Regions:
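Conserved Rossmann-fold dehydrogenase catalytic segment
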Residues: 132, 160-170, 191-207, 226-233, ...
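Oxidoreductase and adenylate-handling cofactor-binding alpha/beta cores
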Residues: 176-196, 209-221, 262-269
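N-terminal helix-loop segment corresponding to the beta1-alpha1 unit
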Residues: 1-182, 186-192, 377-400
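Short Gly/Pro-enriched turn/cap motifs at secondary-structure boundaries
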Residues: 63, 228-233, 238-239, 345-348, ...
Length: 400
């Protein structure tokens, strides 16, 4: 897909200036760009976003996903001239997105108050570890720390081991997602009132927001959830079970679904057993029930168990690896993974734009730009009227 492809999606009339780096802020920008917004990402000259060199394998590809559909320019935000350039970009934008430590933009003369004086309807999206206020606001914060503080890390892993982590930067993407939600709500508010505002999304609070009923469980019942491995305490059966040739996940914790599972297992009597007949009883006898199911699954192949679960309408599935996703007909039918042409790869595969929209579907028009400052001439020339000579001068002095 060429960079001149026409943007599609519900946000094609929105311009966002992205000042963030790495994951949390840029994930919000990625979602906006996927939905058609004109996202102009500002990177420091000479080095760029550190994510450009992050990744595994022979080539760092994280950048290609995170900065897809974005136009990338350089500006030295530590220099007054660089700040002035960015201020001019923001003056003509709908939104500005940043994920620096709280107070950084203020030190650069880019506070919301200063920017909104020139652009009263401006929406500022601020993503940070701890938020813009409070005693921890000035601390450096990464996803790992936010996941720990927000309570998620304590619940991850086996009960007899130290807390573990998910294999992804969940805190970052959660914060970016909530930031995007806040920004879209702020756009709606601006349409009705003309007012801009600040979105303050922290990593730890984004994690806290998905912690279900852990807070009231403790304050009302003095109950603290603990690590439980592949199961959830008192929710049964919902676990990963051994098969002859692999492992398989079964989630049959609702009463009617559990009855269907018992029929599939050829043991309908279990559904009327007092130990398992009701949700609460199954939770109290979770270990016994998991052992019974595991004894049954280990005598069958993964495909055999899957066929029985499908036949009886029991929610279940294989534990997919990346190759499994690429080979799966459902992924293919819904185009969940697509080929994106690039200069280096004719068919670079990556996850598509989600969610799907029946009227205003977004698309991947290009991947993260290869060259640092690739859109300097286009953006600074078209939007600010700078000439090639102006840009050459700014480049020679490390302003861009």
């Amino acid at each position: 897909m060429k960079e001149e492809s026409t943007a599609t999606g519900p946000l094609t009339d929105v311009r966002l200036i992205e000042l963030g780096q790495l994951i949390a802020g840029p994930f919000c920008g990625q979602m906006m760009a996927d939905m058609g917004a004109d996202v102009i990402k500002v990177e420091p000259p000479g080095t760029g976003d550190p994510l450009r060199v992050w990744g595994r394998g022979d080539y760092p590809l994280w950048w290609k996903v995170s900065s897809r559909n974005k136009r990338c320019v350089t500006a030295n935000l530590r220099e007054p001239e660089g700040q002035a350039l960015v201020r001019r970009l923001i003056a003509g934008a709908d939104m500005v997105l940043e994920n620096f430590r709280a107070g950084t933009l203020e030190r650069w003369g880019l506070s919301y108050e200063e920017l909104a004086a020139e652009n009263p309807g401006l929406i500022m999206i601020r993503v940070s570890g701890y938020g813009q206020t409070g005693p921890y606001s000035s601390r450096a914060g990464y996803a790992a720390v936010g996941e720990a503080m927000g309570g998620m890390r304590y619940l991850c892993g086996e009960p007899d081991r130290q807390p573990s982590r998910a294999g992804l930067s969940v805190g970052d993407t959660l914060a970016g997602t909530f930031a995007c939600m806040g920004a879209l709500a702020a756009l709606h508010h601006r349409e009705r009132t003309g007012e801009g505002q600040v979105i303050d999304a922290s990593i730890y609070e984004s994690v806290l927001n998905i912690m279900e009923a852990t807070i009231p469980e403790y304050t009302v019942s003095n109950y603290i959830r603990e690590r439980s491995g592949s199961s959830l305490p008192n929710v049964a059966p919902s676990n990963i079970y051994d098969c002859k040739d692999g492992i398989f996940l079964i989630a049959a914790n609702q009463d009617t679904v559990f009855r269907r599972l018992c029929t599939a297992m050829g043991k309908p009597e279990l559904a009327d057993d007092d130990r398992f007949a009701k949700h609460t009883a199954r939770g109290e006898n979770q270990a016994i029930l998991d052992a019974l199911i595991n004894d049954w699954t280990r005598e069958k192949s993964v495909n055999e168990v899957e066929a029985l679960m499908l036949e009886h309408g029991v929610p279940a599935g294989k534990i997919f690896t990346t190759p499994d996703m690429l080979d799966d007909p459902h992924f293919q039918a819904r185009e969940a993974i697509v080929d994106v042409p690039t200069d280096k790869w004719p068919d670079l595969k990556m996850q598509n734009v989600f969610p799907k929209m029946s009227k205003t579907q977004g698309q991947i028009r290009w991947t993260g730009p290869e060259e640092l400052g690739e859109h300097n001439e286009e953006v600074y020339g078209d939007l600010l009227g700078l000439t090639p000579e102006d840009l050459a001068d700014l480049h020679s002095r490390n302003i861009i």
